[in-house]
Regions:
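Reverse-transcriptase-like RNA-dependent polymerase core
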Residues: 1, 47-71
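Catalytic palm active-site di-aspartate
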Residues: 9-19, 76-86, 109-141, 160, ...
Length: 182
């Protein structure tokens, strides 16, 4: 027997594309500063990443041609294999998720056993994000849930774009779970 009435819920898989390569430096800098990283360290890393020159190295040798950024045409991103990329992405995505929650993108659930309310927004692992959607009323229609999912995904996509990121459409999907009383 069900203790609480079942509610329609949804989970959106909204995975990012090229997460380390698309990190914009200004929001990443602000996110790292919020974690206590000194601005001088951030400035050094960002300057190096923006102006670094790269070449291809294989078992056949090193490419004579280089590519990269300059002061006039800087690169973005944190660099694949960089020790700075994972903590930078962690800081950036935690700030983005905080903005998402403050804007109302979250599921509010009350435990029937503890009578405590939990605000859950997502489950994240690196660039793989599952957004949780929960309509406030147990009598909400499937259309209301679908509208909430669309609004939440659009909100998350807008926040991600502000950090330099993109949603990778091929890796995005939605699972709707609805109940019907008989």
């Amino acid at each position: 027997k069900c203790i609480i009435p079942p509610q329609s819920v949804a989970i959106s898989e909204v995975d990012l594309g090229e997460c380390f390569d698309r990190m914009a430096h200004p929001p990443t800098s602000l996110a790292m500063q919020s974690w206590g990283v000194p601005t001088s360290a951030i400035r050094i890393v960002c300057t190096a990443l923006r102006t670094m020159q790269f070449c291809l190295r294989t078992g056949f040798g090193e490419s004579p041609e280089f590519f990269g950024g300059s002061a006039d045409n800087p690169l973005a991103g944190a660099g694949q294999g960089s020790g700075w990329a994972p903590p930078g992405f962690g800081a950036l995505s935690s700030i983005a998720m905080g903005a998402y929650k403050r804007a109302g993108g979250r599921a509010e659930m009350t435990s029937p056993l503890l009578a405590r309310t939990f605000l859950l927004a997502a489950v994240m692992y690196d660039d793989d994000t599952d957004l949780l959607h929960w309509v406030d009323s147990p009598h909400a229609t499937d259309e209301e849930l679908t509208e909430k999912v669309q609004a939440d995904v659009k909100l998350w996509g807008t926040i991600v774009q502000s950090t330099g990121g993109i949603l990778k459409a091929l890796k995005c999907s939605v699972f709707l779970m609805t109940y019907q009383w008989k």
